[in-house]
């Protein structure tokens, strides 16, 4: 009886060992990579950056290294890579959102909603240009980014630039109108006021007090 029990126990140990080894063999390969959260980056590009090849044993996928390699792309703000057993790897990407850009001698610098200059590249269509003498001042730049980020999608396409001043900001529209924004505060209400004035006649508007909009 003891010999039989010992034999059963040994068999269980062997089976457990085989089961533990399976993920590291070609029996359980990666059959697909699922990429989510990417907009600017092409899915194929993310797959290439991960370095994960279809057919790689699931247990041999180095998810930490894959995440580090994807994070090396300037568009990537953060990334998570995890195994989705039995045969897939999930790559969840959070990209920088280019809300604004600055034209410099070396090219167009994209600025995200945190004020980070993260890439020199062609700006997206919905990014707003930042101009003016104070654009190099970090505090003024943060204020300008906050203004640009608050502009609604419906208004954004009509805004050509935000002029960065020391304490005040002005918006220029694509058709040459001016909107005085004032200080970078109460931006949510000013953005709502902006939606209204863009539908009005006039060449110059002031939304620095969003509850008392003026025009001329």
Would you name each region that the model predicts?
Residues 43, 47, 63, 67, ...:
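Extracytoplasmic/secreted envelope proteins and their assembly/folding machinery
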Residues 4-41, 48, 57-107:
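Periplasmic polypeptide-binding modules associated with outer-membrane biogenesis and secretion
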